[in-house]
Structures are given as structure tokens and as C-alpha cells.
């Protein structure tokens, strides 16, 4: 399955919520009418079945983190094999992706831009260049913008946007040095309450 490269607003409208696919330079409401479904008329569908609700939740989370279906299923299988709640394990594995950590630290304005920074070798982990977006960052790892990319305007702008919206508590960032430490894996209570991971577990358990 190829990665989606179409309009980001269409995805947010499909799920009926902000998927944080846009940079936030302008208010989402000025660009996307997320209350309306995709299409010219944007009419909402009728009541969803239980399966439909579970599928939509899975698609929402998959699109938030920019993960393909095959990758997402792999994360679920890894989460199910670990101790603890499968749903929480799944979200933690997604949060530990390098492209997501780069986004959380504010080096990219979106996860998509952060993934591009990683792929273009603009990011290092513990002093070594890593160009794999799915690389699992561990507590204590130092994630930084490489010297050759420090002056990139999009990184400077992303840091400014992040300063406005605020950073998460599980990363410690030195914006001047464009470097940060991944302090710990976030607990479920630290993550979005708008995600119902139990629906995803129910979907894959069938």
C-alpha cells in the first residue's frame, strides 16, 4: 500500500477530528471544515456498526502517526506480545518512533515533515545519523538536528510553533542547540484522551 500524498484536510474530515497533519500556522478551521465529511456536499453517514466504529478508530490512529496498514498491524502484534495492556503498549510503540519524537521535540512542524527530516539524514541519535523513521527511541537517547541542517528555515519555524503550543513532558529540549533528550516512555494518561485504543484491540482480536 502506497503512502497517502493527497489533501491532508480530506483525512481529517473523514475522521471528523483534527489529526494534527497540518503545521498549525493558521487555525485548522480556516482550512478544513472537519465537521463535514469529504466531498462537495459533505453529508455525514448514518449510524455506524460496531465494526465500522472500530475501523474508523484504527484508521484515525494510523493516520495520526503516518503509519501504513502493514506497519500498524506489526505494531499491534508487537504490543500484544508484551506484558501489560495491549492498547497502551501500541500507543507507546508509536510514540517511540523516531519521526514522532522529532515532532514532539519541535524539530518538525508535523509528523510528515519530521519523517522527511529523518529520511533526509538531518537527525542524529546519540551522535549517530539515523535515517529510519520507525527507529525506536529509548529513554535517555539524545536526539538532535545534525550540524549541516541546523540553519534550515523549516526547523527554525517548527521550533517557534512548538514553543507556542508547548512541549510534552517526556522530552527535554535545548532549542538553541536543537537537541533534546527522550526522558521516558509516556504513560497512557500523558497521551490524547481522544483516542480509544480499546476499539483497535477489539478490531484486531476478531
Curated annotation (Swiss-Prot):
UniProt cross-references to NCBIfam families, sorted A to Z: PRK05327.1, rpsD_bact
Pfam families: Ribosomal_S4 (PF00163), S4 (PF01479)
Protein name (Swiss-Prot/TrEMBL): Small ribosomal subunit protein uS4
Assembly information from the UniProt record: Part of the 30S ribosomal subunit. Contacts protein S5. The interaction surface between S4 and S5 is involved in control of translational fidelity.
Gene coding for it: rpsD
Keyword match RNA-binding: yes
Organism lineage string: Bacteria, Pseudomonadati, Pseudomonadota, Gammaproteobacteria, Pseudomonadales
Gene3D superfamilies per UniProt: Ribosomal Protein S4 Delta 41, Chain A, domain 1, RNA-binding S4 domain
GO biological process: ribosomal small subunit biogenesis; translation
Amino acid at each position: 500500500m502506497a503512502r497517502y500524498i493527497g489533501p491532508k484536510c480530506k483525512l481529517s474530515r473523514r475522521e471528523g477530528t483534527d489529526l494534527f497533519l497540518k503545521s498549525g500556522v493558521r487555525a485548522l478551521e480556516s482550512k478544513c471544515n472537519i465537521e463535514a465529511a469529504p466531498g462537495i456536499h459533505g453529508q455525514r453517514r448514518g449510524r455506524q456498526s460496531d465494526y465500522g466504529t472500530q475501523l474508523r478508530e484504527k484508521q484515525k490512529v494510523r493516520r495520526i502517526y503516518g503509519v501504513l496498514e502493514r506497519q500498524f498491524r506489526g505494531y499491534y502484534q508487537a504490543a500484544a506480545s508484551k506484558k501489560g495492556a495491549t492498547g497502551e503498549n501500541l500507543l507507546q510503540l508509536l510514540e517511540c518512533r523516531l519521526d514522532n519524537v522529532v515532532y514532539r521535540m519541535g524539530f518538525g512542524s508535523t509528523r510528515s515533515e519530521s519523517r522527511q527530516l529523518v529520511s533526509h539524514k538531518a537527525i542524529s541519535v546519540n551522535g549517530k545519523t539515523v535515517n529510519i523513521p520507525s527507529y525506536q527511541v529509548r529513554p535517555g537517547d539524545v536526539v538532535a538536528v545534525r550540524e549541516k541542517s541546523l540553519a534550515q528555515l523549516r526547523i527554525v519555524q517548527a521550533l517557534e510553533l512548538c514553543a507556542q503550543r508547548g512541549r510534552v513532558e517526556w522530552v527535554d529540549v535545548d532549542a538553541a542547540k536543537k537537541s533534546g533528550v527522550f526522558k521516558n516512555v509516556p504513560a497512557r494518561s500523558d497521551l490524547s484522551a481522544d483516542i480509544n485504543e480499546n476499539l483497535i484491540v477489539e478490531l484486531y482480536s476478531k
